[in-house]
């Protein structure tokens, strides 16, 4: 999944064991020896040095989390997903990749996404606007053009 979102990169899940940690002498292969999973990625090259999640920017961490979520969904799918501003910290190229991924995955599940970015709107097929007036929120179906117009007004100049 990571390579679909970042074609030039590579992502891996790395199983962490006690004997991988400093000062550990346990070479046991039992379940108790496994202590977690780490994420290791490269955004620039398949041969580039891998970085740990702690070294990444907020947007890169978000992209890694989304790749992991999408991979888990492939193994254990649900019929419905609600994602709130999942693209907020992503660069435009990654917002487009995530929108395309959701469009592809939506063939087998329903996705409801909130966004203030045009890339997600381009891939969607139904749009709703939320209006807050007189201390009351209301929702109405809107056109793609209205949705794009709204998010473009919200973008910093």
List each model region and its residues.
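Terminal ABC-like ATPase head and other globular end-domains that cap long coiled-coil arms
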Residues: 1-157
């Amino acid at each position: 999944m990571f390579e679909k979102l970042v074609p030039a990169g590579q992502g891996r899940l790395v199983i962490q064991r006690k004997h991988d940690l400093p000062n550990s002498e346990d070479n046991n292969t039992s379940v108790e020896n496994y202590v977690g999973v780490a994420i290791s990625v490269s955004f620039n090259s398949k041969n580039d040095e891998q970085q740990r999640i702690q070294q990444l920017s907020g947007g890169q961490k978000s992209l890694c989390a989304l790749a992991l979520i999408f991979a888990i969904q492939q193994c254990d799918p649900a019929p419905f997903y609600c994602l709130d501003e999942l693209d907020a910290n992503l660069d435009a190229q990654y917002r487009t990749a995530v929108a395309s991924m959701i469009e592809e995955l939506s063939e087998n599940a329903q996705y409801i996404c909130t966004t203030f970015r045009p890339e997600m709107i381009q891939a969607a097929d139904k749009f709703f606007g939320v209006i807050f007036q007189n201390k009351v929120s209301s929702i109405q179906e809107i056109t793609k053009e209205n949705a794009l117009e709204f998010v473009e007004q919200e973008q910093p100049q």
